């Protein structure tokens, strides 16, 4: 049965065989015809049932559910990207199985220029019947011979040819160039191929041929080739539909929905393999006696039932079976049949298309029937056209039901209310049948009204698409190499991180001794962490960014906080120092009035998150402004004195400033109230810094050899002496040069949220210039500084985000991109944030090892209080920091505690501890 189409019409050889019984009367004839054609009528409800059943089978197969076996296979093709129009180069295409008993070789040139197409050169070779049914090696040797014969006629270099292999049979793919044949269809039954990798079989045959050096880059089926050959247009072409000898569809599915891939990101083209759909509940009611006969007489009874109602290999045979039945019943041809009419394969798809085409007229129908050895009358011609229309209309409607299921799956996958998509169509049924596509589109609109579908005829029968798959694979491989080269400096190994740890240990030692060092190692005069006995009401001020907070902190058996946020206008932050501190005092007075504290003199802790050299607990000399502050006449001054002077200017305000604290110390103290082992503070937010409890004997410039003191490392400046030069990239240099403090805070500029987004932006600009991103087109929005905030980095790397959500975030920023672009942007973000976390971890490892050695311990158990938006919000940062510390400081058990309001609560606790210690001293 699968050999239908090989014989064609045999004119002049037939003798008529006529029914000897009396012919039916006109009314009986009409009833017989209606009864026969009625079998091919499919109701809307039946189409909807097929749509729903197929959709259910698709979802079952995507989930990897094996029992009961799904009715469709949903095979991933490992084609993860659709073309974007810039692909170029020369490619060889070998098509096997797309057009029945022939193979085709093409030479395809892609220009990469929109609207400029070069017609492919091609040659078709008929496959002998003995090859189709012989040994597998014989088939692939035949294919390799055809390749060589075609290429011999082309003016081409014999070396380095890239080939795309279109193999249109059900296959299990495990890679773009690895595909195992599941089963033969379409009349092929070559031995020794099922269960084998067809790409390897082709490579072996090419090697045996020995004439050309050909790299088989990709294997796809004709359906994928059809989709990929669709010209990029206004709407994405993400569905391929082929109705040729057989029928199938493919579409771009979210990779996370394809269980067998175990991938979270990106998309993959899935071959539905709907020809094998055979749900008895859905298909049973629409199967006719003719379908059963056709199936029974085929090479594969019971298989490919859906395909046998739609594919071009079978439409002519269905028409033949109906015509033979009506002739035997005496309704057609005066009750006469012919040997041709009773022979399989005598009516081809081309005959059906011609007989139904209104432009050919009755004369062509008459001629075709005469070639079958029949003598049709005028009424016979009209009835034959009705039969052709009934068979083909049903095929188009069934195909539409299946396509509607695919569109519903795609819509659900994208979580879109309405779906706008282009469907690339290919195959001789779509191309040659006069009404197939119009019936198809009308039925799809009926079954999937929420989908706006454009049917786009394929170019070159899918051959160009196979070349496009090959070209896209080559482009992606080249882009992947460029991306890896760009990101390689951000991927730090153990030795590099250990070197950072060692460099920091040296800088710490120098700073503690008072020698020149990029780490200032500033004494904070905080000599103890909380012990839980602290009590009282305290005020806290928190100045470290564009917002300023005033807090009332009540310490009893727990800590209660009341606070208010006040903004600091840019004119104040960059105006005079007096203006800044007067504004701060105004905010404090406003807060006291609102809280009913006017006239009270509560102990006050001042969180001042800028580099200071402390001369006492309540004396801090500002070394330099950071974070965009530039208030004049402050650097080199005691900021507590500046605050007290502003209090004096305000008059009638009494404030007892007990301690000046930076946010890092406040974080350590805040967590220390909950965990006595917390002796390290870490901030990773807009900026970054760390502090820890150092042995007083190691701190030069502070009298005393016993006890401990918290040291403010100011590690953001680590590397300002050039010690991090080996890790600095061209992108770090660009960010540094564009900053307000070039050459300073080099460590901070590789770690903190204020700079990571800028590093990402500079990398994206570089990749765009290489043509890797945005099709090489300069995006104006990408020229804008600081468009990537910490929140953006945290959101885009979230494990819970699908790729479409990553794209949405980027599109909201004004960056139009493809799924491939989105994946690459994601990788860039991951590389930059991973390096930041690892560098931070190397710093923490240096600190904990210093504490362990200070105390002469084999093992140290210590806690780190952490604050900062990057650390808290980023999905991977905290775990990467912890993993790096474990790797570099294996003898330290380090617990990370997230601080709750370290800047406010911590400053109050520093004040509370100072009051407790002062009270003990008085006692």
UniProtKB/Swiss-Prot annotation:
<protein>
    <recommendedName>
        <fullName>Hexokinase-3</fullName>
        <ecNumber>2.7.1.1</ecNumber>
    </recommendedName>
</protein>
<feature type="binding site">
    <location>
        <position position="714"/>
    </location>
    <ligand>
        <name>D-glucose 2</name>
    </ligand>
</feature>
<dbReference type="InterPro" id="IPR001312">
    <property type="entry name" value="Hexokinase"/>
</dbReference>
<dbReference type="GO" id="GO:0005524">
    <property type="term" value="F:ATP binding"/>
</dbReference>
<feature type="binding site">
    <location>
        <begin position="438"/>
        <end position="439"/>
    </location>
    <ligand>
        <name>ATP 1</name>
    </ligand>
</feature>
<feature type="region of interest" description="Hexokinase small subdomain 2">
    <location>
        <begin position="531"/>
        <end position="661"/>
    </location>
</feature>
<feature type="binding site">
    <location>
        <begin position="221"/>
        <end position="222"/>
    </location>
    <ligand>
        <name>D-glucose 1</name>
    </ligand>
</feature>
<feature type="binding site">
    <location>
        <position position="248"/>
    </location>
    <ligand>
        <name>D-glucose 1</name>
    </ligand>
</feature>
<keyword id="KW-0418">Kinase</keyword>
<keyword id="KW-0677">Repeat</keyword>
<dbReference type="GO" id="GO:0008865">
    <property type="term" value="F:fructokinase activity"/>
</dbReference>
<feature type="region of interest" description="Hexokinase large subdomain 2">
    <location>
        <begin position="662"/>
        <end position="901"/>
    </location>
</feature>
<dbReference type="GO" id="GO:0034774">
    <property type="term" value="C:secretory granule lumen"/>
</dbReference>
<feature type="binding site">
    <location>
        <begin position="542"/>
        <end position="546"/>
    </location>
    <ligand>
        <name>D-glucose 6-phosphate 2</name>
    </ligand>
</feature>
<keyword id="KW-0067">ATP-binding</keyword>
<feature type="domain" description="Hexokinase 1">
    <location>
        <begin position="27"/>
        <end position="471"/>
    </location>
</feature>
<feature type="binding site">
    <location>
        <position position="245"/>
    </location>
    <ligand>
        <name>D-glucose 6-phosphate 1</name>
    </ligand>
</feature>
<dbReference type="GO" id="GO:0005576">
    <property type="term" value="C:extracellular region"/>
</dbReference>
<feature type="compositionally biased region" description="Polar residues">
    <location>
        <begin position="1"/>
        <end position="18"/>
    </location>
</feature>
<feature type="binding site">
    <location>
        <begin position="790"/>
        <end position="794"/>
    </location>
    <ligand>
        <name>ATP 2</name>
    </ligand>
</feature>
<keyword id="KW-0547">Nucleotide-binding</keyword>
<dbReference type="InterPro" id="IPR022673">
    <property type="entry name" value="Hexokinase_C"/>
</dbReference>
<feature type="binding site">
    <location>
        <position position="222"/>
    </location>
    <ligand>
        <name>D-glucose 6-phosphate 1</name>
    </ligand>
</feature>
<feature type="binding site">
    <location>
        <begin position="662"/>
        <end position="663"/>
    </location>
    <ligand>
        <name>D-glucose 2</name>
    </ligand>
</feature>
<dbReference type="GO" id="GO:0061621">
    <property type="term" value="P:canonical glycolysis"/>
</dbReference>
<feature type="binding site">
    <location>
        <begin position="542"/>
        <end position="547"/>
    </location>
    <ligand>
        <name>ATP 2</name>
    </ligand>
</feature>
<feature type="region of interest" description="Hexokinase large subdomain 1">
    <location>
        <begin position="221"/>
        <end position="460"/>
    </location>
</feature>
<dbReference type="GO" id="GO:0006002">
    <property type="term" value="P:fructose 6-phosphate metabolic process"/>
</dbReference>
<feature type="binding site">
    <location>
        <position position="168"/>
    </location>
    <ligand>
        <name>D-glucose 1</name>
    </ligand>
</feature>
<feature type="region of interest" description="Disordered">
    <location>
        <begin position="1"/>
        <end position="30"/>
    </location>
</feature>
<feature type="binding site">
    <location>
        <position position="273"/>
    </location>
    <ligand>
        <name>D-glucose 1</name>
    </ligand>
</feature>
<feature type="binding site">
    <location>
        <position position="748"/>
    </location>
    <ligand>
        <name>D-glucose 2</name>
    </ligand>
</feature>
<comment type="function">
    <text>Catalyzes the phosphorylation of hexose, such as D-glucose and D-fructose, to hexose 6-phosphate (D-glucose 6-phosphate and D-fructose 6-phosphate, respectively). Mediates the initial step of glycolysis by catalyzing phosphorylation of D-glucose to D-glucose 6-phosphate.</text>
</comment>
<feature type="binding site">
    <location>
        <begin position="688"/>
        <end position="689"/>
    </location>
    <ligand>
        <name>D-glucose 2</name>
    </ligand>
</feature>
<feature type="binding site">
    <location>
        <begin position="304"/>
        <end position="307"/>
    </location>
    <ligand>
        <name>D-glucose 1</name>
    </ligand>
</feature>
<feature type="binding site">
    <location>
        <begin position="185"/>
        <end position="186"/>
    </location>
    <ligand>
        <name>D-glucose 1</name>
    </ligand>
</feature>
<keyword id="KW-0808">Transferase</keyword>
<feature type="binding site">
    <location>
        <position position="903"/>
    </location>
    <ligand>
        <name>D-glucose 6-phosphate 2</name>
    </ligand>
</feature>
<feature type="binding site">
    <location>
        <begin position="867"/>
        <end position="869"/>
    </location>
    <ligand>
        <name>D-glucose 6-phosphate 2</name>
    </ligand>
</feature>
<dbReference type="Pfam" id="PF03727">
    <property type="entry name" value="Hexokinase_2"/>
</dbReference>
<dbReference type="GO" id="GO:0051156">
    <property type="term" value="P:glucose 6-phosphate metabolic process"/>
</dbReference>
<dbReference type="InterPro" id="IPR043129">
    <property type="entry name" value="ATPase_NBD"/>
</dbReference>
């Amino acid at each position: 049965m699968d050999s239908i189409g090989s014989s064609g019409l045999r004119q002049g050889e037939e003798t008529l065989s006529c029914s000897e019984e009396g012919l039916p009367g006109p009314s009986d004839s009409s009833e017989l015809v209606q009864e026969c054609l009625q079998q091919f009528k499919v109701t809307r409800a039946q189409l909807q049932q097929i749509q729903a059943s197929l959709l259910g089978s698709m979802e079952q197969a995507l989930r990897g559910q094996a029992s009961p076996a799904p009715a469709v296979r949903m095979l991933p093709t490992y084609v993860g990207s659709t073309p974007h129009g810039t692909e170029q180069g020369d490619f060889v295409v070998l098509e096997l199985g797309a057009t029945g008993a022939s193979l085709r070789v093409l030479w395809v040139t892609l220009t990469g220029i929109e609207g400029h197409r070069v017609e492919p050169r091609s040659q078709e070779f008929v496959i002998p019947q003995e090859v189709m049914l012989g040994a597998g090696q014989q088939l692939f040797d035949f294919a390799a011979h055809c390749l060589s014969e075609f290429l011999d006629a082309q003016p081409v270099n014999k070396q380095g040819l890239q080939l795309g292999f279109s193999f249109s049979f059900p296959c299990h793919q495990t890679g773009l160039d690895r595909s195992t044949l599941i089963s033969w269809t379409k009349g092929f039954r070559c031995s020794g191929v099922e269960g084998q990798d067809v790409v390897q079989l082709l490579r072996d045959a090419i090697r045996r041929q020995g004439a050309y050096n050909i790299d088989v880059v990709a294997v796809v089926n004709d359906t994928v080739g059809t989709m990929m050959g669709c010209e990029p247009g206004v709407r994405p072409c993400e569905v391929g539909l082929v109705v040729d000898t057989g029928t199938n569809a493919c579409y771009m599915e979210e990779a996370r929905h394809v269980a067998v891939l175990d991938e979270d990101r990106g998309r993959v083209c899935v071959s539905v393999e709907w020809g094998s759909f055979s749900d008895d509940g859905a298909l049973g009611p629409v199967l006719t006696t003719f379908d059963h006969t056709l199936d029974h007489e085929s090479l594969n009874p019971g298989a490919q039932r859906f395909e046998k109602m739609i594919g071009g290999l079978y439409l002519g045979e269905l028409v033949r079976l109906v015509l033979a039945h009506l002739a035997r019943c005496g309704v057609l041809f005066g009750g006469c049949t012919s040997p041709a009419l009773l022979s399989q394969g005598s009516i081809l798809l081309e005959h059906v298309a011609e007989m139904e085409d209104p432009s050919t007229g009755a004369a062509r129908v008459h001629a075709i029937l005469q070639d079958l050895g029949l003598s049709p009358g005028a009424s016979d011609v009209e009835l034959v056209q009705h039969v052709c229309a009934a068979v083909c209309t049903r095929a188009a409607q069934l195909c539409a039901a299946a396509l509607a299921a695919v569109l519903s799956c795609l819509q659900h996958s994208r979580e879109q209310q309405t779906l706008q998509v282009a469907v690339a169509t290919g195959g001789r049924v779509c191309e040659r049948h006069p009404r197939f596509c119009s019936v198809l589109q009308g039925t799809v609109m009926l079954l999937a009204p929420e989908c706006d579908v454009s049917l786009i005829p394929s170019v070159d029968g899918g051959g160009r698409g196979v070349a496009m798959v090959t070209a896209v694979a080559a482009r992606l491989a080249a882009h992947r190499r460029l991306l890896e080269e760009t990101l390689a400096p951000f991927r730090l190994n153990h030795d590099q991180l250990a070197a950072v740890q060692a460099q920091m240990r040296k800088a710490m030692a120098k700073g503690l001794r008072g020698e020149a060092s990029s780490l200032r190692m500033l004494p904070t005069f905080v000599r103890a962490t909380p012990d839980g006995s602290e009590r009282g009401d305290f005020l806290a001020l928190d100045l470290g960014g564009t917002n300023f907070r005033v807090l009332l902190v009540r310490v009893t058996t727990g800590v209660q906080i009341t606070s208010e946020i006040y903004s600091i206008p840019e004119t104040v932050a960059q105006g005079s120092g007096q203006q800044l501190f007067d504004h701060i005092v105004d905010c404090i007075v406003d807060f006291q009035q609102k809280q009913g504290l006017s006239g009270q003199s509560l102990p006050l802790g001042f969180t001042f998150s800028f580099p200071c050299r402390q001369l006492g607990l309540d004396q801090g000399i500002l070394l330099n402004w950071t974070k965009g502050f530039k208030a004049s006449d402050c650097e080199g001054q005691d900021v507590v004195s500046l605050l007290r002077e502003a209090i004096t200017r305000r008059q009638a305000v009494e404030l007892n400033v007990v301690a000046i604290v930076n946010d890092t110390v406040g974080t350590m103290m805040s967590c220390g109230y909950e965990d006595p082992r917390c002796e390290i503070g870490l901030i990773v937010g807009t900026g970054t810094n760390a502090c820890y409890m150092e042995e007083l004997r190691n701190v030069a410039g502070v009298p005393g050899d016993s006890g401990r003191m918290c040291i403010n490392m100011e590690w953001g400046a680590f590397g300002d002496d050039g010690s991090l030069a080996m890790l600095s990239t061209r992108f770090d240099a660009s960010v540094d040069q564009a900053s307000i403090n070039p050459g300073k805070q080099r460590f901070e500029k590789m770690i903190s949220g204020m700079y990571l987004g800028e590093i990402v932006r500079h990398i994206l600009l570089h990749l765009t210039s290489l043509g890797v991103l945005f099709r090489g087109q300069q995006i104006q929005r990408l020229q804008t500084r600081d468009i990537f905030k910490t929140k953006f980095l945290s959101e885009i790397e979230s494990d819970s985000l699908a790729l479409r959500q990553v794209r949405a975030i980027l599109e909201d920023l004004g960056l139009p991109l493809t799924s491939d672009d989105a994946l690459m942007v994601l990788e860039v973000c991951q590389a930059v944030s991973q390096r930041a976390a690892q560098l931070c971890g190397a710093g923490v490892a240096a600190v904990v090892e210093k504490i362990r050695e200070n105390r002469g311990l084999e093992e140290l158990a210590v806690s780190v209080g952490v604050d900062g938006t990057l650390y808290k919000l980023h999905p991977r940062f905290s775990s990467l920091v912890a993993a790096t510390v474990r790797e570099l400081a294996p003898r330290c058990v380090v617990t990370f505690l997230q601080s709750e309001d370290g800047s406010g609560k911590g400053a109050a606790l520093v004040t509370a501890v100072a009051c407790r210690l002062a009270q003990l001293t008085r006692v």
